[in-house]
Structures are given as structure tokens and as C-alpha cells.
């Protein structure tokens, strides 16, 4: 990161009641002298004229001055809060740029300054963008929790535990005559198991946070003519898929992106799964399985007129056995308008079972509520944090190293190799908060921010 003084409009482009210009860097005080004729008292609102190079007034408004390191960016910061007309704001930026050495900020550069000056860690910086982009109250609350350090605190706790255990293991290695006793006394194993348990908990919360941010991928799967396309239409609230009585009508993947109370949901309708000689249908079935393997949840559609069973293993064991081990399954018994089934929601063998009529819409609202709960929707809006795909990847990598380290301890009692896996775990976790992060990754993250943030 350079030490340039940067300027940008901090409010959204366009017409508004108030417009804010933000300047951050060593020359902020020089800009204040040029435009205001004085440096405002630190952290006080100063109503004054904003003047051009000839002393003519461009606008009137509030000037706020924050002396580093006691500012958002950690640098000296000047904010000019004037009227929200775009022409006036452009004139102010042009005037600021007349001060030699000032340049326009890149997207996210103010937040990057804050990160580089240890005012924020990387998860908190990302949470700023996530708070701005939030599409639901739950997402906004979770992003705010991350901004306030909830996610970071849990990651830092894990890093501290891993670091302390690594130091203990390395101390044992330094005394080779006693190393085996150290490794087998149960203390190291106990600490390692507790770290793994804690990491599993954080990983589960992060997955929920990623769903809140990015949306849940739900695949509707089942045999031909079970009503999958009708359910897609019912959930989407429009006729997205062609529905006929002919089995195999849907031959390709159909996608709909909807919001349930602001929670993003990616619904995917797939070709009916069956053995077929039709080449085009075979391709559709292959694509269906590809979508299922990357789904967060499967709605297993069952034609209620063909079976009374509710246990998916009984309905179609080959299908269930092929599903990824940790994939969530919701059984949806369709055509309740024909079978006369009560529109109840039950649990069977650990799976939620819904009775609906996709054609008439009966029971669909209850299914929507279920999907919202799976996405982490909470009416009280308490708890949880936002997470991104890179966070999940780092947590998965950390888990992988811990499991390898566990094997080195339990099977081989190899202290050096355990210590190395703990070091790799520490690095993977530290990437989340930015303690060990490449410049390329930082550039990618901050470039996705708004200009002025």
C-alpha cells in the first residue's frame, strides 16, 4: 500500500440531500487549509465555506477532521459534508485534486488503509462491504456482528490454541529423551481434540454465514413427473418451467434466483432421474447429478400417488446412497390434492417430510418457511456472523491439517510432523483475518468494494 493522500466521494453518486467527500492521508490538513482556510478542531463539526482556488465559495457545509491514528483509516482524515448535487460534489473533488500529491482513491482503498494500519482485520473489512450489500435484515445483522469482531474473535481463539499446542509439542521435541512421554501423556491429544471440536463449531457457523451472504443452493430432484417443475414455478411465483403430463419434459437444468424475506435462494429444477436411452435426456440427468453434488439442500420430490412411504431410503435407496454424505435432504410428498393427505410436516429417520400440492400451492408456504430456517433466518435477528467462500476454504484447509496431525500423533507419535501440521493450521486460520495473506488476495478483496469505502 502507498502512503498517498487519497480522495473520493463517500456517498452514492447522484442527487441527494447530503454529499460527502472523504480525504485520507498526510496531506489532509493541507487540503483543509486550501479549501477552508483553517484546520478544523479535531473531532468537532465545523460549519464553514468550501472555497475554490480564487476564494469563491463552491458550497457550504460541515467539515470534520480526524487526526491519525484516531480515525477510521488510521491516517489523518478530512470529511466535507455538503449538499448532495453531483455537480457540486464533482467541483469539490476537482478542487481537492488541485492540491499537489492528491489522487483519486481506488475502490476499497479507505478500508484497505484501515486494514494496513491495524484498525480492522480482514474479516471486519470484508464485513463493511457485506453490510452495504446485505439483502435481508438477517444478512445486515450478521455482517454487523462480523464488523464488530464476532468472527475474528473465534478465529483468534483458535489460532491462540493452535499456537500454544504447537509450542508445547516443539518443547517436547527439544527434549528427545522425554518426547515419547510427552506425546503419550494425553495432554497433547486432549488439547488437539478440543481444538478440532472448536474448529468444527466455527466451521458450521461459517457455513451458515456463507449461506446468509451468498444464498442457499437448493436442487429439486426426483423421478420424472413427480412435480419438480411445478414446485419450481410455485416457489418462484411464475411459470419458469414447462409443465406437462409427459414424463421427461424437463431435460436441462433450470435456475431461479428468488428472495424469501430478503434471504437469497438459488432454486434448481433438474431432469427426472431414470434410466433412459434418449441421449439428450441422459445429458440432462448427468447435469442434474452435477448440480446435486454441489447443492446445500436437496428437495427430494416424491409422487404421493405412487407410494405411501416417507423414508427416502425406502422410497429410492439407490438415489439416497449416491448423495454426498453431508447433503441435507428434505422429503416433499407431492400431489396431496389427489391423495387427500393432510398437509402435515413430520420427521422420519432424521428427515423433514412435507405434504404439498405444487399444482395448487397447498403446503408450499410451510416449505418456504422451512427453507428460510435452513438459511439461518431468525425472527429475533440475534447471533451469527457473515462468512465468505474463502473463509470456508481456509477453515476446510485448517481441518485437513489438524486431521493429518491427529494421525501423526495417534499412529506414529511423530512430534515433528505434528508440529508442522499445527504450523500449517495456524497459517490457514491466519489467512482469514489477514495475518498471512498475499498481496494478490488483498487486491482482489478490496477492489470489489465501493469507491469511497
Swiss-Prot record:
It is found in: Cytoplasm. K(+) binds at residues 225, 244, 246, 249. Its main location: cytoplasm. InterPro entries: G_TrmE, GTP-bd, GTP-bd_TrmE_N, GTPase_MnmE, MnmE_dom2, MnmE_helical, P-loop_NTPase, Small_GTP-bd. GTP binds at residues 225-230, 244-250, 269-272, 334-337. Keywords: Cytoplasm, GTP-binding, Hydrolase, Magnesium, Metal-binding, Nucleotide-binding, Potassium, tRNA processing. CDD domains: trmE, TrmE_N. (6S)-5-formyl-5,6,7,8-tetrahydrofolate binds at residues 22, 79, 119, 453. Its EC number is 3.6.-.-. Binds 1 potassium ion per subunit. It comes from the Bacteria. Exhibits a very high intrinsic GTPase hydrolysis rate. Involved in the addition of a carboxymethylaminomethyl (cmnm) group at the wobble position (U34) of certain tRNAs, forming tRNA-cmnm(5)s(2)U34. Belongs to the TRAFAC class TrmE-Era-EngA-EngB-Septin-like GTPase superfamily. TrmE GTPase family. PANTHER family: TRNA MODIFICATION GTPASE GTPBP3, TRNA MODIFICATION GTPASE GTPBP3, MITOCHONDRIAL. This is tRNA modification GTPase MnmE. The lineage of its organism: Bacteria, Pseudomonadati, Pseudomonadota, Gammaproteobacteria, Alteromonadales.
Amino acid at each position: 500500500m502507498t502512503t498517498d493522500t487519497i480522495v473520493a466521494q463517500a456517498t452514492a453518486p447522484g442527487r441527494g440531500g447530503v454529499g460527502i467527500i472523504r480525504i485520507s492521508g498526510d496531506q489532509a490538513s493541507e487540503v483543509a487549509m486550501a479549501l477552508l482556510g483553517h484546520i478544523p478542531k479535531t473531532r468537532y463539526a465545523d460549519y464553514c465555506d468550501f472555497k475554490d482556488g480564487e476564494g469563491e465559495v463552491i458550497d457550504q457545509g460541515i467539515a470534520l477532521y480526524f487526526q491519525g491514528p484516531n480515525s477510521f483509516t488510521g491516517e489523518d482524515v478530512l470529511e466535507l459534508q455538503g449538499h448532495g448535487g453531483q455537480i457540486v460534489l464533482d467541483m469539490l473533488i476537482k478542487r481537492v485534486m488541485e492540491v499537489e500529491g492528491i489522487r483519486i482513491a481506488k475502490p476499497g482503498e479507505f478500508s484497505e488503509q484501515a486494514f494496513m494500519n491495524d484498525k480492522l482485520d480482514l474479516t471486519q473489512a470484508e464485513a463493511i462491504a457485506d453490510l452495504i450489500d446485505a439483502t435481508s435484515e438477517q444478512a445486515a445483522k450478521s455482517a454487523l456482528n462480523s464488523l464488530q469482531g464476532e468472527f475474528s474473535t473465534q478465529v483468534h481463539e483458535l489460532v491462540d490454541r493452535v499456537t500454544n499446542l504447537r509450542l508445547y509439542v516443539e518443547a517436547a521435541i527439544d527434549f528427545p529423551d522425554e518426547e515419547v512421554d510427552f506425546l503419550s501423556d494425553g495432554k497433547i491429544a486432549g488439547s488437539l481434540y478440543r481444538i478440532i471440536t472448536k474448529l468444527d463449531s466455527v466451521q458450521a457457523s461459517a457455513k451458515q454465514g456463507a449461506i446468509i451472504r451468498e444464498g442457499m443452493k437448493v436442487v429439486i430432484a426426483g423421478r420424472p413427473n413427480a412435480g419438480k417443475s411445478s414446485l419450481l414455478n410455485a416457489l418462484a411465483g411464475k411459470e419458469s418451467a414447462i409443465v406437462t403430463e409427459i414424463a421427461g419434459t424437463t431435460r436441462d437444468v433450470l435456475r431461479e434466483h428468488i428472495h424469501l424475506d430478503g434471504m437469497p435462494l438459488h432454486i434448481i429444477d433438474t431432469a427426472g432421474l431414470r434410466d433412459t436411452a434418449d441421449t439428450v435426456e441422459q445429458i440432462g440427468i448427468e447435469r442434474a447429478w452435477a448440480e446435486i453434488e454441489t447443492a446445500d439442500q436437496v428437495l427430494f420430490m416424491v409422487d404421493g400417488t405412487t407410494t405411501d412411504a416417507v423414508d427416502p431410503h425406502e422410497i429410492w435407496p439407490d438415489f439416497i446412497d449416491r448423495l454426498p454424505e453431508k447433503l441435507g435432504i428434505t422429503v416433499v410428498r407431492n400431489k396431496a390434492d389427489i391423495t387427500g393427505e393432510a398437509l402435515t410436516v413430520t420427521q422420519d429417520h432424521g428427515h423433514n417430510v412435507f405434504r404439498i400440492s405444487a399444482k395448487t400451492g397447498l403446503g408450499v408456504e410451510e416449505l418456504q418457511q422451512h427453507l428460510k430456517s435452513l438459511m439461518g433466518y431468525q425472527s429475533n435477528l440475534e447471533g451469527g456472523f457473515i462468512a465468505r467462500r474463502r473463509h470456508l476454504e481456509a477453515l476446510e484447509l485448517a481441518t485437513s491439517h489438524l486431521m493429518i496431525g491427529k494421525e501423526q500423533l495417534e499412529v506414529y507419535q511423530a512430534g515433528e510432523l505434528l508440529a508442522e501440521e499445527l504450523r500449517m493450521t495456524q497459517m490457514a486460520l491466519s489467512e482469514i483475518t489477514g495475518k498471512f495473506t498475499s498481496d494478490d488476495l488483498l487486491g482482489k478483496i478490496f477492489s470489489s468494494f465501493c469507491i469511497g469505502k
